[in-house]
């Protein structure tokens, strides 16, 4: 007879009658989605984790990662003690001695204090997927170092920059597809775990309502597996497809003319006088002394009825979108939309077929389908609103065609212009911030570009002084660049220089290489938080590991001092001079702030917190607390009172009492402000704010009035509300930039047409002139331009699996059972042509390196592409795993064939493998060949490295490993 009891009873059946059962709410951090969770404890131990049904983001849904968070606590990779490298030991040998936190703080305070007193840029702080950039950026600014960035530069900065410089918002935290009302979704280059639970919920509802889902991706896994249509595409050719779609929509007359005229710069007249320093700029009837961060309404249309130029948005005007005209002084002009039409004429579906591999007829059909739905199936909601020109509207009209895209589109050296093309495609269909289209999430939309600016020269970095500007910003023209008098970079990673002018997230992937090369200057101390830069978060991993341990002729490390803060032993911690043990997300206070990357919904701002459900293990300390402590010891202005005394007791006290300016009422958290918690978004500090968040599911959700929820780029009510609550500086319209005058300003500088302003160094002028095109264009990824495509005929990709987040989870005993090691997925036709068997050993090789791995046949990948999971392969002994674990013996890391730099140019200059506009790392540009491994070769993945030793404080006992599998079970006597 079958046993009827459940397969798994988390609380067990034989409970001690005195057992203390409690449930606590907090926010997950098993990926960047940040769902609400409920953690059940028995006698202080975690028993199981559930989704919180009262949380607006995931509504109770939880994924495999989230439910396995309990394993974080029992991982044998947990770091529990501050560690100092033993004298005489080499980096990478993991030879450490335990020290106290007081010793660790003394070491940091002494070293960083000397740096700040002499040359603050000698300290560099780079952080991974930490979700606390408001704090880390504040620390860097007050320290006075420009050398700060988070992981965005090697993740998806092209997505952020390409969209924000075009529509004032972007996908992911700041916007997304309105699948509640959309009828057609086109998803491009999105990993199968992206925005995990909320996107799964939305897709499920969308499909049940009859929506059509089309996936454009070289690989059909994850979300693509449930798509109604999979359109396989060659990696790095997305821009060609998007430009061909724009061409076809214009050819078929399916663009939304009224929307473009009213809400974009499509009808604005562009100066075409090649001899003018204003060539390519919009014609203005007056020039205000400072345009600030918004588009002043001082440009011109050519009116159809009057047949002459008039001010934009003149009541009753009907401007041309097409045509060529001359001003009274003879200046030739065209509407920006005409320039777009001229540009895309060459980008036909037939042309795109030869580049993308997508049949021309498919491209035509896709364009027709999205254009017809956007035009003929509009949605009208009875929501009255007023635009910024004073026009009152009785309803909101939507075009129910939506898009979603992420890193697969962004992580190419041509990604910025591809994403500009995507943004323009969305715009000409009339889908920006409308029902069924793309919708913003607070604090966006913001002006184009947003207002924060970096320093502009070396004089803005001074000893014992906060940075004069923000560490990261949004340049509007060449004068905003952070360069010296010769036009050379001031930042270590060369962000905001002529090499990468719009590197709005920095270039973390360049930090170690540049510090090792001492280019543009040597640094003293590099602090890496929560980033595995000696393994999966770096390109050409073996060389970077060598750089970290490299010494000069005097026997001194080329990177003199390296601090690593992390919760787990990793490939990176072994190289540290000082290791700081961080807590897990279940052991600390944390906030997803409106000042950073909140979890807002379409209907209004949402922020959230983490509340500790467990005490820290061993001597772990939250990195936030470390920054508060060091900032206080160094007497950084934001962390001390005027008399130099400590201002904040700890991190929770800092979050409660910090204001962006004295009396501003704007802090890290928007909920329950005011002395009694009666105010929202803006108000005095509330001493019980954390307590109120804890009582309210650790989340604050402010629902905007219905009249503020759409058309926010031009919604007067919303913009005034956003200005009042410091989410935008101006309550001015944020028109869509079909034509980017910002890019044209950089191009003019490269052409010598920036009188009295900055010009790029000679070696970079052609580069700037080429890539800073005000209209999107297609070019091959830079690596493809430099590769022998006959020798390396294939593209290679990595993506995150649904059950693991980068390198975080191979030490997670439950998730290991889903992904223990990875294969290289190859189309059977491609593999068989190379005589490679399914499950057989093979080599994958690029001009940068080669890897031996296992092959897995897959029909779900286009024949010209091979791919694998990211970061499943581990170095032997890392992450508390057995040295012979499958992760290191069979698993592999594709990064070994990806270069962080391209071959030097004729002048011997090093060129980063990055987008020339933003510095986005070109992860998916690598070209490879594959071939069968010799049958006599040992059956092990290559390359291999020396076995990494466990670090002091790690519990790698058999008991610990047993707990790692059976955590959550009932206690045994």
What does each of the following model-derived ranges do?
Residues 136-214, 240, 318, 323, ...:
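Extended redox/cofactor-interaction regions of prokaryotic respiratory oxidoreductases
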Residues 129, 262-265, 369-370, 386-389, ...:
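A glycine-rich phosphate-binding loop feature that marks nucleotide/adenosyl-phosphate handling sites
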Residues 85-103, 254-365, 464-493, 610-760, ...:
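N-terminal leader/propeptide and maturation segments of large enzyme subunits in energy/redox metabolism
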Residues 105-121, 175-183, 343, 366-383, ...:
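Glycine-rich phosphate/diphosphate-binding loops that line cofactor/substrate pockets in enzymes
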Residues 1-316, 524, 529-531, 630, ...:
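N-terminal export/assembly segments and adjacent metallocofactor-ligating motifs
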Residues 34-37, 47, 56, 131-135, ...:
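Flexible loop/turn segments at secondary-structure boundaries
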Residues 610-613, 617, 621-683, 807-825, ...:
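Long, contiguous, secondary-structure-rich segments that constitute the structural scaffold
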Residues 176, 586-616, 626, 903-905:
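Glycine/threonine-rich phosphate-binding loop and adjacent beta-strand/alpha-helix elements that clamp
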């Amino acid at each position: 007879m079958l046993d009827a009891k459940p397969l798994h009873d988390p609380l067990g059946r034989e409970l001690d009658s005195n057992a203390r059962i409690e449930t606590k709410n907090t926010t997950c951090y098993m990926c960047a989605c940040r769902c609400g969770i409920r953690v059940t404890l028995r006698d202080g131990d975690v028993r199981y984790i559930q989704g919180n049904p009262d949380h607006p983001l995931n509504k109770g849904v939880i994924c495999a990662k989230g439910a396995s968070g309990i394993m974080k606590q029992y991982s044998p990779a947990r770091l529990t003690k501050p560690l100092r490298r033993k004298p005489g030991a080499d980096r990478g040998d993991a030879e450490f001695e335990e020290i106290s936190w007081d010793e660790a703080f003394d070491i940091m305070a002494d070293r960083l204090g000397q740096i700040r007193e002499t040359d603050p840029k000698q300290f560099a702080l780079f952080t991974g997927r930490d979700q606390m950039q408001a704090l880390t950026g504040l620390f860097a600014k007050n320290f006075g170092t420009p050398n700060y960035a988070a992981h965005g530069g090697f993740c998806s900065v092209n997505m952020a920059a390409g969209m924000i410089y075009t529509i004032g918002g972007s996908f992911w935290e700041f916007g997304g597809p309105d699948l509640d009302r959309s009828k057609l979704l086109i998803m491009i280059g999105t990993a199968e775990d992206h925005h995990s639970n909320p996107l799964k919920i939305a897709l499920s509802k969308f499909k049940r309502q009859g929506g059509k889902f089309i996936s454009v991706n070289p690989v059909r896994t994850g979300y693509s597996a449930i798509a109604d249509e999979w359109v396989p595409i060659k990696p790095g050719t997305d821009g060609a497809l998007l430009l061909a779609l724009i061409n076809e929509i214009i050819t078929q007359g399916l663009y939304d003319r009224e929307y473009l005229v009213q809400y974009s710069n499509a009808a604005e007249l562009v100066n075409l006088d090649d001899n003018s320093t204003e060539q390519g700029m919009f014609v203005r009837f007056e020039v205000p002394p400072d345009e600030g961060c918004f588009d002043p309404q001082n440009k011109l249309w050519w009116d159809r009825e009057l047949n002459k130029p008039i001010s934009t948005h003149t009541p009753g005007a009907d401007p041309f979108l097409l045509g060529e005209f001359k001003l009274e002084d003879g200046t030739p002009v065209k509407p920006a939309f005409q320039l777009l039409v001229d540009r895309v004429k060459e980008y036909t579906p037939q042309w795109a077929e030869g580049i993308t591999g997508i049949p021309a007829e498919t491209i035509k059909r896709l364009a027709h389908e999205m254009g017809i739905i956007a035009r003929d199936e509009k949605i009208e909601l009875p929501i009255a609103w007023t635009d910024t020109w004073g026009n009152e509207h009785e309803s909101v009209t939507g075009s129910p065609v939506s898009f979603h895209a992420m890193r697969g589109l962004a992580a190419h050296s041509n990604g910025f212009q591809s994403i500009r093309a995507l943004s323009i495609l969305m715009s000409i269909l009339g889908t920006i911030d409308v029902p069924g289209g793309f919708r913003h999430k607070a604090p966006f939309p913001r002006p184009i570009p947003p207002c924060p600016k970096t320093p502009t020269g070396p004089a803005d970095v001074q000893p014992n002084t906060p940075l004069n500007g923000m560490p990261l910003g949004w340049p509007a023209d060449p004068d905003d660049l952070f360069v010296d008098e010769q036009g050379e970079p001031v930042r270590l990673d060369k962000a905001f220089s002529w090499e990468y002018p719009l590197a709005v997230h920095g270039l973390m992937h360049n930090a170690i290489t540049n510090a090792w090369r001492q280019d543009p200057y040597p640094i003293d101390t590099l602090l890496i938080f929560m980033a595995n830069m000696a393994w999966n978060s770096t390109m050409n991993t073996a060389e970077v590991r060598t750089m970290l341990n490299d010494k000069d002729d005097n026997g001194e490390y080329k990177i003199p001092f390296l601090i690593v803060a992390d919760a787990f032993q990793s490939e990176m911690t072994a190289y540290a001079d000082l290791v700081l043990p961080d807590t897990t997300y279940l052991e600390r206070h944390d906030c997803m702030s409106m000042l950073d990357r909140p979890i807002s919904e379409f209907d209004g701002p949402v922020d959230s917190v983490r509340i500790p459900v467990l005490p820290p293990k061993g001597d772990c300390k939250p990195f936030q607390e470390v920054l508060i402590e060091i900032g206080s010891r160094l007497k950084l202005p934001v962390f001390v009172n005027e008399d130099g005394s400590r201002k904040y007791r700890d991190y929770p006290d800092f979050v409660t009492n910090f204001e962006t300016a004295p009396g501003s009422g704007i802090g890290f958290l928007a909920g329950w402000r005011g002395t009694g918690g009666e105010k929202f978004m803006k108000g005095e500090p509330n001493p019980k704010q954390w307590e109120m968040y804890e009582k309210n599911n650790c989340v604050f959700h402010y629902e905007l009035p219905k009249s503020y929820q759409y058309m926010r780029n031009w919604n007067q009510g919303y913009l005034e509300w956003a200005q009042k609550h410091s989410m935008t500086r101006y309550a001015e319209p944020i028109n869509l930039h079909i034509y980017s005058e910002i890019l044209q300003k950089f191009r003019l500088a490269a052409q010598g047409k920036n009188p009295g302003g900055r010009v790029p160094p000679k070696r970079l002028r052609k580069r700037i002139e080429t890539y800073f095109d005000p209209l999107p264009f297609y070019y091959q990824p830079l690596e493809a331009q430099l590769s022998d495509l006959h020798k390396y005929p294939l593209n290679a990709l990595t993506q995150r699996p649904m059950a693991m987040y980068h390198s975080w989870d191979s030490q997670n005993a439950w998730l290991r059972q889903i992904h223990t090691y990875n294969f290289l997925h190859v189309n059977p036709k491609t593999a068989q042509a190379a005589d490679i068997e399914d499950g057989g050993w093979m080599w994958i090789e690029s001009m940068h390196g080669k890897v031996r791995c296992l092959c897995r046949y897959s029909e779900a990948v286009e024949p010209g592409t091979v791919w694998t999971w990211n970061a499943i392969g581990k170095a032997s002994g890392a992450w508390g795993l057995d040295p012979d674990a499958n992760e290191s013996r069979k698993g592999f890391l594709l990064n070994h064939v990806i270069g962080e730099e391209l071959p030097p140019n004729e002048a011997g200059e090093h060129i980063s493998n990055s987008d020339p506009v933003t510095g986005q790392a070109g992860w998916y540009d690598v070209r490879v060949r594959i071939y069968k491994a010799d049958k006599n070769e040992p059956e092990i993945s290559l390359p291999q490295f020396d076995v990494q030793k466990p670090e002091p404080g790690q519990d790698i006992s058999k008991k610990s490993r047993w707990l790692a599998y059976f955590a959550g079970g009932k206690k045994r006597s």
